[in-house]
A protein has these predicted regions:
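PDZ/PDZ-like domain segments forming the peptide/carboxylate-binding groove
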Residues: 55, 167-171, 175-176, 236-245
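Conserved active-site neighborhood of the chymotrypsin/trypsin-like protease fold
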Residues: 7-12, 39-41, 53, 58-140, ...
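Structured segments of extracytoplasmic/periplasmic soluble domains
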Residues: 81, 132, 148, 215-222
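Active-site loop architecture of trypsin-fold serine endopeptidases
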Residues: 46, 75-77, 112, 133-144, ...
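C-terminal cap/linker of serine protease catalytic domains
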Residues: 1-24, 184-245
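Short, glycine-anchored, charge-dense loop/turn motifs used at functional sites
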Residues: 32, 62-64, 180-184
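Gly/Ser-enriched beta-turn/beta-hairpin loop segments
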Residues: 41-49, 93-100, 148-163, 195-198, ...
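A short, Trp-centered hydrophobic/proline-enriched beta-strand micro-motif
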Residues: 26-43, 131
Length: 245
């Protein structure tokens, strides 16, 4: 099994239980590490690597884990590191390229509480949240929602209302965004940089959890959503010397 990640979160960024109205440690206990091995000849191997590591979160008591899809796409081997110290094998249930969500089934009894799925639409900019990777408090960042807006990726990816949080989590892939009520409101996808008043600020882009319920049953049963693919126009533009090419 490849080595699991070490988040290395500064204590000054870690959440404190007294700052939240829910049981922080119980919520963090649902977050797991996700480690995968992908064949060298896989389509995504050159871009994403053959050994991948990130996080996921238990969303059902039977061991279903929600994560970000790029960790598990084309994976042949999956390991889940649980909050009680156990490491169990997993199996990829499904992946949705449109949202970026991936599902993994633990292949052993988990016996840990799942994190309740919340409503990302109810969370506004300024809300106090926790972006949690595996490892309990030492793997989590106390953050705030700094924006909700459209996000478009050049790899044919579009979210109508992505969530942006700061400060940034250094191990963002598959991290659980825990809302003010202690429920799951999103999954970490990217780390971005923006300039504000002459200074660079790092933030995370989160896939909102409201995109999951409409496709969850399809992911569980057939591995992908039962819907037509989104059409894309094949144009790629960049700015060079104040001109668009």
């Amino acid at each position: 099994m490849p080595p699991q990640m070490n988040p290395q979160i500064s204590e000054t960024l870690q959440p404190r239980p007294e700052d939240y109205a829910y049981d922080l440690d119980q919520a963090l206990g649902a977050v797991v590490s996700v480690t995968t091995i992908v064949p060298e000849d896989a389509f995504t191997a050159d871009i994403l690597g053959t050994e991948r590591a990130g996080s996921g979160v238990l969303i059902r008591s039977d061991g279903v884990v929600l994560t970000i899809g790029y960790l598990v796409t084309e994976a042949e081997t999956v390991w889940l590191g649980l909050s009680d110290g156990r490491t169990v094998p997993g199996h990829v249930l499904g992946y949705d390229q449109t949202t970026g969500f991936g599902l993994v089934q633990a292949l052993a009894r988990v016996d840990l509480p799942a994190l309740k799925i919340g409503q990302s639409s109810s969370v506004e900019p300024g809300a106090s949240v926790v972006l949690a990777g595996a490892g309990g408090r030492s793997g989590a960042v106390a953050a705030r929602v700094i924006g909700k807006q459209e996000f478009a990726g050049y790899w044919e990816y579009l979210l109508d209302e992505a969530i942006f949080t700061a400060p940034a989590h250094p191990q963002w892939g598959g991290a659980a965004l825990i809302g003010p009520a202690g429920d799951l409101i999103g999954i970490g996808s990217l780390r971005l940089e923006q300039s504000s008043e002459g200074e660079d600020e790092h933030l995370n882009m989160i896939v909102p959890i409201d995109l999951l319920p409409p496709i969850l049953e399809d992911l569980l049963t057939v591995g992908r959503p039962n819907r037509p693919p989104r059409p894309w126009l094949g144009v790629y533009a960049v700015e060079i010397d104040d001109n668009v090419v």
